[in-house]
């Protein structure tokens, strides 16, 4: 992929130098020495841990502010959560990372066939903003599949799945939420795998804690890819090159 790099002067305009100066003042410095250690008395430890809440609560708003400034520079719009797909979607996927590009291509393909599907892209994972997530979910959504690129053995679910499950419980009539895993060991999913996720959501009893991109013939948790899902745009030329090497003995 081709990228356009922002100039250092443009990035410098995004930096709050006053806040940076205040942050650097907290560094250890012989000019204004302080004592710091790894131990803290139990009478105040818990209270000090909770006193950090405000700083974390403020982060999503700060991130949104600077994402707005990036939009002014680049023309690309970013938020803590971004939605892609049908405005009246009844099934959506929530995920983060490079898989979102594959999901977007699959959404375009399925929408051309009349399906009401969508995607929420997680851009700020921690701290997690429940309010911003809920504002991003279309009111028409009935089912959600959360995709995690990790496996938590022994847990009832993977991290993002559990966060989404907790968040949607604040909705009066929450949609059904299921979770799945993908991409471990570079087993990257194809559009046919993503289409299988949406098909699984469409069923009356969708499989939970599923996997895509592999064939699980041991615990049978994998979803079978949908055949003949072609997301190639019109006018695309695809070429396959094969290299053959022979070693000739003398």
Residue ranges and their predicted role:
Residues 239-250:
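Conserved phosphate/anionic-ligand binding catalytic regions in large, soluble enzymes, centered on
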Residues 93, 121, 144, 164, ...:
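Buried hydrophobic positions in well-ordered alpha/beta secondary-structure cores of metabolic enzymes
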Residues 143-233:
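Peripheral docking tails and interdomain loops at the edges
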Residues 68-91, 104, 224-238:
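Glycine-/acidic-rich phosphate or pyrophosphate-binding loops and their flanking alpha/beta elements
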Residues 87-115, 128-135:
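Redox- and metal-dependent alpha/beta enzyme cores, enriched for Fe-S-associated oxidoreductases
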Residues 2-33, 135-173:
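Terminal amphipathic helices with adjacent charged low-complexity linkers/tails
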Residues 65, 73, 105-119, 170:
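Short helix-loop-beta junction
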Residues 1-82:
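Conformationally flexible catalytic loops at phosphate/diphosphate-handling active centers
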């Amino acid at each position: 992929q081709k990228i356009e790099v922002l100039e250092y002067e443009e990035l410098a305009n995004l930096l709050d130098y006053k806040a940076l100066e205040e942050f650097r003042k907290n560094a250890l410095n012989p000019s204004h020495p302080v004592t710091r250690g790894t131990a803290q008395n139990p009478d105040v430890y818990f209270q000090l841990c909770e006193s950090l809440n405000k700083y974390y609560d403020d982060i999503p708003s700060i991130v949104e502010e600077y994402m707005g400034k990036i939009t002014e520079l680049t023309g690309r719009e970013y938020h803590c959560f971004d939605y892609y797909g049908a405005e009246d979607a009844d099934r959506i996927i929530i995920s983060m990372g490079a898989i979102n590009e594959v999901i977007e291509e699959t959404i375009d393909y399925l929408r051309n066939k009349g399906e009401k599907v969508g995607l929420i892209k997680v851009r700020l994972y921690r701290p997690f903003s429940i309010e911003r997530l809920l504002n991003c979910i279309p009111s028409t959504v009935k089912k959600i599949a959360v995709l995690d690129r990790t496996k938590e053995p022994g847990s009832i679910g993977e991290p993002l799945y559990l966060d989404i499950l907790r968040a949607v419980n604040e909705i009066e009539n929450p949609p059904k939420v299921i979770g799945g895993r993908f991409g471990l060991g570079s087993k990257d999913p194809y559009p046919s795998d993503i289409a299988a996720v949406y098909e699984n959501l469409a069923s009356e009893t969708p499989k939970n804690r599923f996997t895509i991109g592999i064939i699980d013939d041991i615990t049978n948790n994998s979803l079978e890819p949908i055949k003949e899902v072609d997301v190639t745009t019109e006018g695309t030329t695809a070429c396959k090159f094969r290299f053959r090497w022979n070693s000739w003995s003398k």
